[in-house]
A protein has these predicted regions:
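A glycine-centered beta->alpha junction motif in the catalytic cores
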Residues: 1, 12-16, 42-56, 170-188
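Conserved kinase catalytic-core helix
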Residues: 1-35
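Gram-positive cell-envelope targeting signals
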Residues: 8-11, 15, 55-60, 70, ...
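ATP-dependent phospho-/nucleotidyl transfer catalytic cores
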Residues: 23-98, 146
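All-alpha amphipathic helical-bundle segments outside canonical DNA-binding/catalytic cores
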Residues: 27, 159-167
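Helical subdomain adjoining the active site within ATP-dependent kinase catalytic cores
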Residues: 49-62, 83, 87, 181-205
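Active-site acidic catalytic loop and adjacent metal/ATP-binding pocket
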Residues: 78-131
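Active-site activation/catalytic loop segments of kinase-like enzymes and analogous catalytic loops
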Residues: 127-158, 169-190, 194
Length: 205
């Protein structure tokens, strides 16, 4: 995937280390922990509602049948979050690069000179944000296992970056809009597929 080569090159050529305090890491830890627990409580509440019903709709049954996948994802994220915090709490520098901050396949122009377009959201931050956004936007369209392996060969991620990426892609997202029962089935099936896909592309720690 030529796009990931451009992204890895971007991150490599713009790398720097910025000062960071324990308070900033603690703030990020708390934000991630709150997001994980909010998502967990959302799905746990629905599980408890559905399990008490005598008859379930197809979408409710789909969630009940696959709830163990969601449950395991939460505890994986919480475990990884604690490991991440242990790794970073004594660090005073954070590695950052120029990031595109909204990567999608449609923003990659491939011709004689390949390049990225739509830089409205660029900033200097941890490079895993680009990886996460690309995965979040294109996980249904691209096989990411080889893509991220290629990226890591060109721009090797630090252990704390790998853990943070794993947390982001493994946290069950929430889609609260309800249209009809069919769409509820599609929504839950998509979430399960997303979590299964995420479990295959997380970095080894």
């Amino acid at each position: 995937m030529d796009m990931i080569e451009i992204v890895a090159l971007l991150h490599t050529k713009t790398i720097s280390f910025k000062d960071i305090t324990l308070d900033k890491y603690k703030e990020l830890y708390d934000n991630l922990n709150n997001n994980i627990n909010y998502s967990f409580n959302y799905y746990e509440e629905r599980f408890n509602q559905y399990i008490q019903k005598e008859y379930n709709t197809p979408s409710e049954f789909l969630l009940l049948r696959n709830y163990s996948i969601i449950y395991e994802a939460f505890y994986y994220c919480l475990d990884m979050l604690d490991k991440w915090y242990v790794l970073v709490k004594d660090k005073t520098k954070q590695r950052v690069s120029l990031i595109h901050n909204n990567l999608k396949l449609e923003q990659f122009i491939h011709n004689t000179d390949s390049y990225l377009i739509s830089w409205d959201n660029y900033r200097y931050d941890t490079p895993i944000i680009d990886l996460y956004n690309l995965y979040k936007n294109e996980w249904e369209n691209v096989s990411f296992l080889d893509v991220f392996s290629e990226y890591n060969n060109s721009f090797e991620l630090l252990e704390e970056e790998k853990i943070l990426f794993n947390i982001l892609v493994s946290t069950p997202y929430i889609d609260e809009k309800y249209i009809n029962e069919y769409d509820e089935c599609v929504k839950y099936r998509k979430l399960i597929n997303y979590l299964n896909c995420s479990s295959k592309i997380i970095f080894d720690i």
